[in-house]
Amino acid sequence: SSTSSGSMTAPSPDPRVGLKAGLMDAGEATWNLRVLSRTPSPERFLGVTNSDLAFLGKYAIQGNYNGWQIWDISDPRAPALTTAYFCPASQSDVSVYRNLLFVSGEGLTGRIDCGGQGVREAVSKDRLRGLRIFDITDIRNPRNVGNVQTCRGSHTHTVVVDPRDTENVYVYISGSAGVRAADELPGCSREAPEKDPNSALFRIEVIKVPLAHPERAAIVSSPRIFQDLVDPASHGEAPEDIAAAAKAAAEARARGMFTAELFGAERVIPPQMISPMLDSIVKARNGTGPATAADSAVLRAALPGILAARFGGDDATPGPRPGPTQCHDITVYPAIGMA
């Protein structure tokens, strides 16, 4: 259904209720908007999560977990694909400044060379977790001119223009993944700040990008802006959510998957988090090949402590829990010096 009357009152009953699911044929409902076109992505990007949009003149740049696309939207009723750049990595948020395109990479499988084979090793020189920089002066032939690695990757980022600095642009990075091993990126630490002042927790990264030499982009500051925050009060999960989580955990356990107590409930730990840890255990015993049952048993015993360290301690510790160790998005207002 569609409503475009300009009314400030939401339609009732809610037209979104009961819409059918689908990849390209899902049900739709709009309010005060008109759909001008529906253009599918190229096949390599279909069925893969899309992320952010950025705009440059007549172009829309569409982030996707398999890379990014550039669309000519001069005619919004018939967008034309200009560039499709295959470069898998979550979450591929995009921003553009002049001729530079910035793309976030956070997942464990993203590669520096943009290959689709992923990265299985717990520690690898091929992994990209951080910020990719492309020169899109020739928008049909973008060039990867720089990469900046960070300890927690880049879930999202924000481009910041300092009105007093015309030679550089700055990118604020927020990474929400686990801290990578120091063997992969020296200086990374998942210890609490009181144990290690160089901890990668509770901070963002500020990257300085020289406009004339973007290949020299580098981290220039890591402000610990979340220090001393405490976990906000929570009303807890709804009974149906608790029941669904318990059912999912029981089914996962029956299939041999990993579960652990986290935030007061048994949770399923996703394979993409488990695989690198198993690989590390195999490597620690100088083994090769897939993990054994004994390796899995070692990880199951260690997992509660690993999760407690990564996600803020256990519920038995007295006092308020630590607050978030990262944020999702960063909003800035450079003209008044606020973020």
Stretch-by-stretch model annotation:
Residues S1-A339:
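Feature marking well-ordered beta-strand scaffolds used for ligand recognition
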